Amino acid sequence: MNQQLNTTRKSTAARGRMGLVGGILLVIGTCIGAGIFFKSERVLQNMGGNTTLALLVWLMAGITVILMGLALVEITAKAAFDDLALLSWTQKFTNNTFYKACKRFLIWIYLPTTFFFMPLYLVQSLQDGLRGFGVANHFNTPHDWAIWMVIVLLINLWFFFTSGLSVKWTSVQNVVLLLLKVIPLIAVVILALWLGASAEQMERQPVVPVKDFTAISPFFGWFSAMGAIFFAFDGFYVSAAAKTQLKKQKNYRK
């Protein structure tokens, strides 16, 4: 009887998990952060308006992100302690004091701020998109901030509750969000090439000097820009634990 019950539980758990394709899409959707849409202008400002330095920063940061992803693939493919991703690695490779400090930081600071700022970035993207198409991005009331805050809270509550319903439902939501992030990325490249080809017909805007500590010299701006780019891909640490939700995990260990 107990053996039959255990078999039923295992089969139910397996059905609740995602397949390999769903896992790949989850990792891609998590790693492509919405922050990348806000960082290009900031990176250029940190470089003092120097396009060449900005391109070098993006190139170096992109290579670093790829290498970091490959390193995490090696860790998660061969380690049996990745259920909690970063926390599991901290517990395994560091002392107990550092592990507890990391755990408290993630629980009390990182997760609450992430749950707040990610929907806020989504709302900012929506506002920028509406403004770009000439559509009003406000409600024309003196309390617009409160309305947007309610929208952010509703988005938080929606993902907080629906993500825990089932892995399948989470995968569907991830595919939708992935499309919403990938389509603008492709569209931006196409628009940039098209606008670049007709640059002679565009009115050039003067470069306004940035009065910021990070823009005093390219040295400070370089590190500030690196941090801004890395923030857009910080989903690596979360997505590394996705393997625990895959079906037939042993087939994907190597």
Curated annotation (Swiss-Prot):
It is found in: Cell membrane. Keywords: Cell membrane, Membrane, Transmembrane, Transmembrane helix. It comes from the Bacteria. Signal peptide: none annotated. One of its GO terms (cellular component) is plasma membrane. It is a multi-pass membrane protein. InterPro entries: AA/rel_permease1, APC_superfamily. It holds the Pfam family AA_permease_2. The chain crosses the membrane at residues 18-38, 53-73, 105-125, 145-165, 175-195, 213-233. GO terms for molecular function: transmembrane transporter activity. Its main location: membrane. PANTHER family: AMINO ACID TRANSPORTER-RELATED, MEMBRANE PROTEIN. To M.pneumoniae MPN_308 N-terminal region. This is Uncharacterized protein MPN_095.
